């Protein structure tokens, strides 16, 4: 379960599974904006203030981001 005001894990999964070719311009813009907000929220919220699942997800995402 994601923390309040963060993108749910289900929503993130759906966005990744849906091909861009089947998304509207508005959907793509919304995903981009909410994704950027989620990344900022992840960076500015300390791991101690996150739920266990959100902390694990953010750590995994940071690991992936560092590898790219």
Curated annotation (Swiss-Prot):
Q: Give a Pfam family name.
A: HSP9_HSP12
Induction per UniProt is: Strongly induced by heat-shock, nitrogen limitation, and upon entry into the stationary phase.
Task: Extract the InterPro entries matched here.
Answer: HSP9_HSP12
Q: What keywords sit in the KW lines?
A: Stress response
Q: Where is this region: Disordered?
A: 1-32, 44-68
Per UniProt, what is one GO molecular function of this protein? Answer: lipid binding
Which source organism?
A: Schizosaccharomyces pombe (strain 972 / ATCC 24843)
Compositionally biased spans, kind Basic and acidic residues = 1-18, 47-68
Family assignment from sequence similarity: To yeast HSP12/GLP1 and C.albicans WH11.
Q: Is Oxidoreductase among the key words of this record?
A: no
Q: Which GO terms describe its cellular component?
A: cytoplasm; cytosol; nucleus; plasma membrane
**Protein's name according to its UniProt entry:** Heat shock protein hsp9
